[in-house]
Amino acid sequence: MEDTFLFTSESVNEGHPDKLCDQISDAVLDACLEQDPDSKVACETCTKTNMVMVFGEITTKGNIDYEKIVRDTCRDIGFTSEDVGLDADHCKVLVNIEQQSPDIAQGVHGHFTKRPEEIGAGDQGHMFGYATDETPELMPLSHVLATKLGARLTEVRKNGTCPWLRPDGKTQVTVEYRNDHGAMIPVRVHTVLISTQHDETVTNDEIAADLKEHVIKPVIPEQYLDEKTIFHLNPSGRFVIGGPHGDAGLTGRKIIIDTYGGWGAHGGGAFSGKDPTKVDRSGAYVARQAAKSIVASELARRCIVQVSYAIGVPEPLSVFVDTYGTGKIPDKEILKIVKENFDFRPGLITINLGLKRGGYRYLKTAAYGHFGRDDPDFTWEVVKPLELEKPAA
């Protein structure tokens, strides 16, 4: 028997209270950037029964209707009555937004006087980017499957295939892997877990049958399922009360779901509600582009990149690369290639990845993952052709 191991990733869908908060924070960011691309945004959201509050620091020339953004976002997700967990049109909306601290503003941007390469990081911190050749997206399979199951739950709820579904839900996938000299080879799906909110009318048997037919079958490739695959479908029994009525929600509570499903590493900084001067977001995006480009160019089968910053300082303090023993050339050579091909200064990341553009851009990232998505707005997913040093003749 070959040596294998199990690894698990989870996801939540857009009606989960924490994810609702992420989406509201990013909808606010989108609105600010659309009206004023130089907006400085640090927008947090929290929610509980019948209440949503947005709070934080925002400096923008835009005229932002925060309450409308909150209600529209909740409504689009499907929170249209107290039965489903929140009533977008009648819930309490509290707004407590202040301007960015002038101390931070002068240290970071003096943004009207400084050239882009002089803009300092908005805070200290360290961020990671990760890539692996186990899927076409160059993302971990356990994470990809958990995420796609969550997205599919929402799809069949909104298109009427499973009318008994309600917005809140969670998924989790355990994959059996083989380690091939540092590269990850998925062998099979060991366990699939789905807990979804539903209305009172549906039976547990109907839930299980519909989830297998309309959610699991279309998402998980047949080659990974066998007679030993375990399914836990709403294992707690009933899940009628959900959304903010079931649990309180908070922006930035789902950072592993947003990234790599427990693979790679995480510096701890959340993404949603933050403009691109916040390196928690822009640093993690460029680190993903670097790691993905290394794997896509077949310099390694698996790669992690770390970058770190000091507040007010444009140049990163450190850049680190590890290819888990899968590199075609030594890691120190790959590190050199990364440093020569990617500019980690926040002002330049923002320009190179076009991060000042709002619209529906960031709202899309706030559910179903920031990485491995096939969408032109996810500019950090574009593989950069790497210029390699030609050895001297």
UniProtKB/Swiss-Prot annotation:
Main localization of the protein described in the UniProt heading: cytoplasm
Listed GO cellular component terms?
cytoplasm
Cellular location(s)? Cytoplasm
Chain sites annotated for binding L-methionine: E57, Q100, D247, K278
Q: Which cofactor does it need?
A: Mn(2+); Mg(2+); Co(2+); K(+)
Its BP terms in the Gene Ontology are: one-carbon metabolic process; S-adenosylmethionine biosynthetic process
Q: Which residues bind ATP?
A: H16, D168, G169, K170, S236, G237, R238, F239, D247, R253, K254, A270, K274, K278
Would the keyword Nucleus turn up in this protein's UniProt record? no
For this chain's record, the cofactor binding note is: Binds 2 divalent ions per subunit. The metal ions interact primarily with the substrate. Can utilize magnesium, manganese or cobalt (in vitro). Binds 1 potassium ion per subunit. The potassium ion interacts primarily with the substrate.
EC code(s) of this entry: 2.5.1.6
Q: Which reaction does it catalyse?
A: L-methionine + ATP + H2O = S-adenosyl-L-methionine + phosphate + diphosphate
- Can you tell which superkingdom this protein's organism belongs to? Eukaryota
Q: Which Gene3D superfamilies match?
A: 3.30.300.10
InterPro entries, A to Z = ADOMET_SYNTHASE_CS, S-AdoMet_synt_C, S-AdoMet_synt_central, S-AdoMet_synt_N, S-AdoMet_synthetase, S-AdoMet_synthetase_sfam
Q: Where does Mg(2+) bind?
A: E10
CDD domains documented for this protein? S-AdoMet_synt
Q: Which UniProt keywords are listed?
A: ATP-binding, Cobalt, Cytoplasm, Magnesium, Metal-binding, Nucleotide-binding, One-carbon metabolism, Potassium, Transferase
What Gene Ontology terms describe what this protein does at the molecular function level?
ATP binding; metal ion binding; methionine adenosyltransferase activity
Q: Where does K(+) bind?
A: E44
Tell me, what's a Pfam family for it? S-AdoMet_synt_C
The pathway it acts in is: Amino-acid biosynthesis; S-adenosyl-L-methionine biosynthesis; S-adenosyl-L-methionine from L-methionine: step 1/1
- What family does the Swiss-Prot or TrEMBL record give for this protein? Belongs to the AdoMet synthase family.
Function summary: Catalyzes the formation of S-adenosylmethionine from methionine and ATP. The reaction comprises two steps that are both catalyzed by the same enzyme: formation of S-adenosylmethionine (AdoMet) and triphosphate, and subsequent hydrolysis of the triphosphate.
The subunit structure is: Homotetramer.
Q: Which HAMAP family match?
A: S_AdoMet_synth1 (MF_00086)
What protein is this chain from? S-adenosylmethionine synthase
Q: Which organism is it from?
A: Musa acuminata
Q: What is the taxonomic lineage of the source species?
A: Eukaryota, Viridiplantae, Streptophyta, Embryophyta, Tracheophyta
